[in-house]
Amino acid sequence: MENNSLHKLGIDIGSTTVKIALLDADDNILFSDYERHFANIQETLESLIRKAYDKTGDLSVCPMITGSGGLTLAKHLEVPFVQEVIAVSTALTHYAPQTDVAIELGGEDAKIIYFEGGNVEQRMNGICAGGTGSFIDQMASLIQTDATGLNEYAKSYKAIYPIAARCGVFAKTDIQPLINEGATCLLYTSPSPRDA
């Protein structure tokens, strides 16, 4: 059965993943998913849209694209583009109006957004990838797990080791010898030296 009401299709094309969310007219999420794109953005987006179609059937959609990798595709597809901080702050203001601070970890950057009296202020670390999604993935792969696996390790930690927090390169330099000594599940609850 075809549904002719207009649905919102949000597309976020980041440096490492493509994410989509399909909402009905009442802003209920009908479908959401993400996949790593491995520099194959169009194919990954097609795969996600196919999954959404398989779950929801034929729908009329109003798409919008955001994300660091989305501008070129938005122009190519003639779909509206919304800068990602505006997209995040607009969504949070609507869906979680009590929010005063939001932290977004991207694949290669980290952003913090402050909400104060109707004003939105954003700061971004785009210089170093330490603490971003890619860095977390790299650290997880060192101990042959994923980001979810890191959560499981953190739940059962037994010791805390100081790890450099200033830079991802220094953190990895601290982490690798600890892993080599067998300290796998002990690392991911470790604060930086200034927190210890």
What are the roles of these predicted feature ranges?
Residues 1-84:
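N-terminal glycine/serine-rich phosphate-binding loop of ATP-dependent small-molecule kinases
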Residues 120-155, 159:
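Glycine-rich phosphate-binding loop plus the immediately following alpha-helix
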Residues 35-39, 85-91, 126-133:
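Short, acidic/turn-prone active-site loops that include or flank metal/cofactor-
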Residues 188-196:
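Single conserved hydrophobic/aromatic residue that forms the stacking wall/gate
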Residues 154-187:
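A mobile "lid/hinge" subdomain adjacent to the ATP/sugar-phosphate binding pocket shared
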Residues 2-3, 69-121:
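Conserved phosphate-binding catalytic cores of ATP/NTP-utilizing and phosphoryl-transfer enzymes
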Residues 19, 62-68, 105-115, 168-176:
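Acidic-glycine-rich active-site phosphate/pyrophosphate-binding loop
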Residues 37, 49-57, 96-103, 140-147, ...:
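Structural signal for hydrophobic packing residues in well-ordered secondary-structure cores
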